[in-house]
Amino acid sequence: MKICFALSAAVLSSIPLFAEPVSGLVGPNATVQVSSTVPMEIIKEMLVDEGSKVTKDQKIVQLRNDREQMDVRISEKAIELKQWIARGHDRLFQEKMGSEEKALESKTDLELSRIQMEAKKLALEEKTILSPINGIVVKKYKQTGEMATQQTPLVDIIDIDTVDVTFFVKATVRKTVAEGQVIKVKIEELDGAEFEGKVNFVDPRNDAASGLVRVKVKIENKDYRIKAGMKGLAEFGK
């Protein structure tokens, strides 16, 4: 009887733990909510719609910028004049017909005007809102002509060029899972199509309530077949 029990224990210990697939949830690689870059301004034009694919630094919202454009043009003309004045004072100083003090004063005035123009250009650039990531616009909160503020979102953008599938596995599996490990994931909504991913995060904490460990698997998704919110199945502890 003892021999049978020992044999049974040996057989059970040789069976891989958690051989049954663990279900996980697909999430985007990144989610960004974009707001206005200035405290308050009228939207001159919304340049994207829901579903638009965008690239990093692409223009997505144009705020009203007529005043800033005018300020830059005025600064450019002022600099042209001050360049002419500075050259004249420098020439007079070189020919000993003018003072060094006047030449330095006009040169300093020119440099200050250039700095001021850079500040005006920055104010103009802030009126054009750029996408911070490559991705897809999934939510549009504002329309052309509405007010944009730093407290209210304009658009939501997600990046699903790669996706993260989040699993919660038993703590005993932790020792068999490591970052960089290749894991095969089946996506239920794609008729069980199998994708190869890599573990990119193993939570060093156990969930206090369930005792489970969070594990993330990253999968390449250049064709966008896998959607956020789908379910994935994977085996751990094999």
What are these regions (language model features)?
Residues 138-139, 193-238:
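Structural microfeature recognizing short secondary-structure transition sites
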Residues 163, 167-193, 219-234:
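Surface-exposed connector loops and short turns at secondary-structure junctions
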Residues 25, 41-47, 53-59, 130-173, ...:
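Surface-exposed patches in structured soluble domains
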Residues 59-61, 67-68, 188-192, 238:
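Short, charged beta-turn/beta-strand-edge "cap" motif at the junction between a beta-strand
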Residues 52-136, 141-144, 149, 164-166:
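Amphipathic alpha-helical coiled-coil/rod segments that serve as protein-protein coupling scaffolds
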Residues 36, 48, 65, 142, ...:
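Short, conserved catalytic or interaction motifs in soluble domains
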Residues 21-42, 115-132, 157, 200-207:
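Short beta-strand-turn/beta-hairpin segments enriched in glycine/proline and small hydrophobics
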Residues 4-16:
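Bacterial N-terminal signal peptides
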